[in-house]
């Protein structure tokens, strides 16, 4: 039996682009299926429309839907639209007067927190939280193999202290000089390290060392050369120029988002620290209180003290440890992650002013090496901090299984 469904509306705001508005909403329910129609007012451009499932005015604290179809969680043009969704078993069945749906319209320069790219079809969807991801949310391995989940990092206007403080017991002063960094834009960052399944879906081959395990598709791509990811090695001179046939170029062509690339060194560290200035999540500094630190990193990452299986250290499935405060997994350990910047020591930040949107040194101080971050399954704890950096050869055949990647892109919909 169909009946009206109580509806709550919310509108996102943006400073530069006109914000579309949702109106003329009509809903009907049939068992656990909800059908919704709405219109998007014409501000001169399309907008992203998302939904939340509410119970007594609050978002359900579980994955909301098993599936959705129609014009929702995507970029839509002004006009009339419809969509439907099936409420997941973990949520209460729709009830008139208690259940609500909140529709939100987002400007294209201020998209939702989560973006998901279908690596097979190229479809792009946006979601307000991981609870909005259909079919089980992040627990479904679909989001580790055939889809790529990106998290918007709130960087616009933010300033943070990059590098390590003098209280960190194993700091490498010459490559971790503390300095202020500011950003002018938000950006998206991969929730997970790029997996072998995702790598194969984009490049058609598996170059990883640990590719013959039962769960290999969900393990991070390892033994990854930077040249396979972006091709050209002319950063920062040529910006985000990519070579045809590289992974980022293929991904951008498939989904229409051409800003996919590696993060900069500053972007990676800002995303890793997630609002703190610490070596590890939950405010853990790498000081003399070793017990607390070891306890912290074991909860958040795979490194040389906990990664062994049958006596052999190895990478593990992504997302098995706790995420940081911004929902990013495996920022400490598992595989070391390439960033764009040239590896250079004793960089000069002596003027005291924040460096804005830094792109790194114009050249490497160590034989053309680029920076890798986060440590790996074979690294010691001190090499898995938020500020430790290491130089590796751009296309070296001697990378080892500890090299991987986490993708980034602009948080602006084109």
What are these regions (language model features)?
Residues 4-13:
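Sec-dependent N-terminal signal peptides
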Residues 40-45, 55-57, 89:
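Extracellular acidic, Ser/Thr/Pro-rich low-complexity tracts
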Residues 173-180, 284-286, 331-414:
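Surface-exposed recognition segments
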Residues 32-36:
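Structural beta-strand segments of beta-rich domains
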Residues 11, 18-20, 100-205, 249, ...:
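Short, compositionally biased
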């Amino acid at each position: 039996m169909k009946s009206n469904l109580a509806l709550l509306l919310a509108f996102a705001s943006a400073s530069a682009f006109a914000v579309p508005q949702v109106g003329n909403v009509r809903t009907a329910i049939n068992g656990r299926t909800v059908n919704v129609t709405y219109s998007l007012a014409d501000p001169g451009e399309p907008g992203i429309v998302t939904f939340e499932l509410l119970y007594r005015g609050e978002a359900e604290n579980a994955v909301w839907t098993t599936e959705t179809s129609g014009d929702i969680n995507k970029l839509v043009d002004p006009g009339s639209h419809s969509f439907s969704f099936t409420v997941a078993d973990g949520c209460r069945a729709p009830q008139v007067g208690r259940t609500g749906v909140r529709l939100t319209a987002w400007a294209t320069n201020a998209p939702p927190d989560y973006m998901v790219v279908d690596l097979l079809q190229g479809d792009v969807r946006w979601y307000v939280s991981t609870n909005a991801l259909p079919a089980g949310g992040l627990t479904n391995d679909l989001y580790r193999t055939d889809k790529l989940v990106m998290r918007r990092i709130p960087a616009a206007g933010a300033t943070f202290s990059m590098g390590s403080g003098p209280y960190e017991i194993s700091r490498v002063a010459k490559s971790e000089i503390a300095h202020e960094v500011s950003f002018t834009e938000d950006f998206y960052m991969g929730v997970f390290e790029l997996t072998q399944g995702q790598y194969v879906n984009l490049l058609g081959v598996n170059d990883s060392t640990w590719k013959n395990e039962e769960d290999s598709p969900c393990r991070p791509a390892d033994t990854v050369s930077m040249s396979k990811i972006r091709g050209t090695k002319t950063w920062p001179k040529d910006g985000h120029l990519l070579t045809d046939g590289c992974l980022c170029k293929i991904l951008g062509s498939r989904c229409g988002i051409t800003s996919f690339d590696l993060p900069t060194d500053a972007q990676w560290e800002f995303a890793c620290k997630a609002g703190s200035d610490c070596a590890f999540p939950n405010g853990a500094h790498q000081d003399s209180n070793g017990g607390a630190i070891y306890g912290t990193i074991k909860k958040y990452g795979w490194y040389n003290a906990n990664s062994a299986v049958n006596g052999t250290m190895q990478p593990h499935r992504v997302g098995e440890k706790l995420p940081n405060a911004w929902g990013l997994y495996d920022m400490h350990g598992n595989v070391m992650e390439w960033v764009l910047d040239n590896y250079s020591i004793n960089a000069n930040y002596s003027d005291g002013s924040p460096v804005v949107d830094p792109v790194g040194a114009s050249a490497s101080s160590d034989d053309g090496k680029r920076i890798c971050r986060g440590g790996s399954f074979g690294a010691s704890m001190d090499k898995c901090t938020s500020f430790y950096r290491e130089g590796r050869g751009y296309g070296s055949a001697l990378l080892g299984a500890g090299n991987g990647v986490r993708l980034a892109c602009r948080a602006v919909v084109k």
